[in-house]
């Protein structure tokens, strides 16, 4: 059985580590000077969406700017992920990525709108998702 409190605690610790790094880089520039969009490539209401909303609330307070959760579901996460790739690489559009979308989809779909290695720069780890194939 999944212990939600344990998962939430791990997410919050990761969030703390992530925001510490962002805060030090923000001190060197005026970033962020506007709202940040956090794209979730899945429908609202799931674990990924809930995690994104918790993260956005806490990071928004920490950074002093609003974080907007933008759900872009479809094609096993490829639609939202592709939109992040096409966004300006200015740090104001972030992706809450998932192993399935970034690692498995390139091997399952013939034409995906991104290259996981070339198009993304990891910022931090939020949690783990256990995938079992039978």
PLM region spans:
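Juxtamembrane cytosolic interface motif at the C-terminal end of transmembrane helices
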Residues: 21-25
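Well-ordered beta-strand positions enriched in small/hydrophobic/aromatic, beta-favoring residues
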Residues: 94-95, 123, 133
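Short Pro/Gly-enriched coil loops immediately N-terminal to beta-strands
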Residues: 118, 123-130
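N-terminal secretory signal peptides that target proteins for export/translocation
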Residues: 1-6
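Hydrophobic/proline-rich hinge and linker segments of small-molecule sensing/allosteric domains
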Residues: 104, 110, 127-134
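Bacterial N-terminal signal peptides
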Residues: 9-20
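N-terminal (or domain-start) structured segment
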Residues: 26-118
């Amino acid at each position: 059985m999944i212990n939600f409190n344990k998962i939430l605690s791990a997410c919050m610790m990761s969030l703390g580590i992530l925001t510490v790094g962002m805060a030090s880089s923000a001190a060197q520039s005026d970033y962020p000077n506007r709202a940040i969009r956090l794209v979730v490539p899945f429908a609202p209401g799931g674990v990924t969406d809930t995690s994104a909303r918790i993260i956005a609330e806490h990071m928004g307070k920490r950074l002093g700017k609003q974080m907007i959760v933008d759900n872009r579901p479809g094609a096993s996460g490829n639609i939202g992920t592709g939109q992040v790739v096409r966004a300006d690489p200015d740090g104001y559009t972030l992706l809450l990525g998932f192993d399935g979308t970034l690692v498995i989809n390139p091997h399952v779909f013939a034409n995906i709108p991104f290259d996981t290695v070339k198009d993304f720069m990891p910022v931090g780890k939020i949690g783990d998702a256990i995938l079992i194939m039978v």
